């Protein structure tokens, strides 16, 4: 029977005995992706990619389409769940040295970039006030590119300002990118199982492994159940918790919101962008805030893989986590003292983590030799 063969495949998949709950977020991300694809399809059926009708079509979905409110809220809050899971997934990779599995890490970072692009395009689609102005601010960064900037911006906008062609192509990109994410996710999983998962100790797991089914399948199901309960609780009782009040008004190019800010999951990158008082410098810092993840497999100098036995690196990691939260917080505040100073210091500390990583490894190796 085909389903028995699938179970056999999972049953024969060897997994380290000591992997913790932090290793469950990969399967949760797969569940989030499936949810986003299904709800996204049903929303696309009723959505109209036109600047005069987009906002009204969202209202139509939530009011008139049977269970449209649920689809819309599941899709919007599901995106937040997706990013919560992916940030925990990346933090796990950083802490336990999973980035030393180079191919898996590099494909995962590419997935993150694609996911962020997809989420950005999706945020523009309701054509609310904050959607419009966030799109204006972020796409305007392309003009900072020397020589090509203005041409690229005009090409992306489909004119000399954000208008109907921009919304149409953003909808097309938001629809097509998830298929790229599916393909790359498959590659990511394939590359992971070439070498196998790491473990909290950062040691070779070959000497002590158990079958994936039933042990890990039940563990995955528990975490998926918890995530589903959380998601449905927010959808049912606090559906607007992540929404911006400005986005309940239709886009008006003549009125600028008092404070333009993206969704919460982009705040760290937006905070880094704002901390540099130069357009090109800010755009480069924004790009580097993600691209720095690509350097980790090549700058690891410690003899130990995991941070479990590296107290100095643990301190650095938790400082980095706090920095991430501080940048996100300052990005929600207006551009005035003391927030500008705090965000500049936090942005500097954010990048210092990637610089201190090889130095800490070298220092620990020296201490171990004493």
Swiss-Prot record:
The keyword Transport applies. A ubiquinone binds at residue 193. It is found in: Mitochondrion inner membrane. GO terms for biological process: mitochondrial electron transport, ubiquinol to cytochrome c. The chain crosses the membrane at residues 25-45, 69-90, 105-125, 170-190, 218-238, 280-300, 312-332, 339-358. The cytochrome bc1 complex contains 3 respiratory subunits (MT-CYB, CYC1 and UQCRFS1), 2 core proteins (UQCRC1 and UQCRC2) and probably 6 low-molecular weight proteins. This is Cytochrome b. It comes from Chilabothrus strigilatus fosteri (Bimini Island boa constrictor). The gene is MT-CYB.
